[in-house]
A protein has these predicted regions:
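Domain-level signal for soluble alpha/beta catalytic cores
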Residues: 1-135
Length: 135
């Protein structure tokens, strides 16, 4: 939800600018993570009545969302990048790789060609690939 604001600010200024978003799926209705609802069918609600601060887990952005965000931010010239509260090492790796860096954590990037069901590696059993198409 902050990308339109970052673009607007970037167009208005010429100095250095930072982007350090939270790694959670905020919305226009809930622009911060302090009052994000859990609409994922959770039947065991947090004792304090909201997801913040201890029940945000199902609201995380995934690696692909993070990469797309930081690729876009990098394109518009914002160079001081990072992730704020709740970031995982995977989120930080996506920031680095989105701007073309290879970091020590890059060696842990998924290798989908070796996935037991969705892989394209010659060792991937055909019956498992077929199962994945219908799973």
């Amino acid at each position: 939800t902050m990308l339109p604001y970052l673009k607007e600010i970037r167009e208005a200024i010429s100095c250095h600018m930072a982007a350090l978003p939270l790694p959670f799926r905020t919305t226009e209705e809930h622009p911060t993570f302090f009052n994000l609802p859990d609409n994922n069918g959770c039947t065991c609600h947090a004792p304090h009545g909201r997801t913040f601060p201890t029940a945000l887990d199902p609201l995380y952005c995934n690696r692909y969302e993070m990469r797309a965000f930081f690729e876009e931010v990098n394109k518009i010239g914002i160079k001081l990048l990072g992730v704020c509260c709740g970031a995982t090492p995977m989120h930080q790796r996506e920031v680095a790789e989105a701007v073309g860096l290879t970091v020590p954590a890059s060696k842990y990037r998924e290798k989908m060609e070796n996935h037991f069901m969705y892989g394209t590696n010659e060792r991937t059993a055909k019956h498992m690939q077929d199962y994945g198409d219908n799973a």
